[in-house]
Amino acid sequence: NSEGIGVIHIVSDTISINLKPDAIYEFLHGMRLKSYSFDRYKSKKDSKTLKVNMISSKKFNKKIYDKFKAIELGVNYTKDLVSEPGNILHPDEYAKRLSQLKKIGLKVSVYDEKQLKKMGCNALVGVGQGSIRGSYLVTLEWRGKKSNSKPLAFVGKGVCFDTGGISLKPARFMEDMTYDMAGSAVVVGLMKNLALRKSKVN
């Protein structure tokens, strides 16, 4: 319409196939993930809005809804981190943002360059010496089960702006240089998801 707002009504009971209990939530989840856009620094944002009304005879299940909402928040947080330009999300800022995840129940430990040297993490420190920014190792912990349960561990590399090693990358690849921290961003999004869902895992 003239206001840039579209409305869709979906009546799930008219679908002539047997749907599993969380199929409706999966459908909405997919729509929300598809609607992601990183427009934080755009002066003119897309004003178009799509409102979806899901009509069903089945009772609303908040537990299932919250599960998919937590997944969405984790995925989109990862996308936000990867999409940030290198002059904004440098190692100092990245470590600062990860520290803020304490608010959702994660245990966050940040080790700076001085501590890394004591720990013998010389390869990590060596890579970081190519930047005026600090080097950090950040651990995120979620304990949703008994303390004696075996933990799952995920490791991700977080080079915020990778210009190359022995050979510098040409300028035409500059927009991709922030993607070298995507591995760590995926781990961060996963940990946020686990914490928001109160997952029974360590």
Which sequence ranges carry the predicted segments?
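Short acidic, Gly/Ser-rich segments with clustered Asp/Glu that frequently serve as metal-coordination loops
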Residues: 159-167
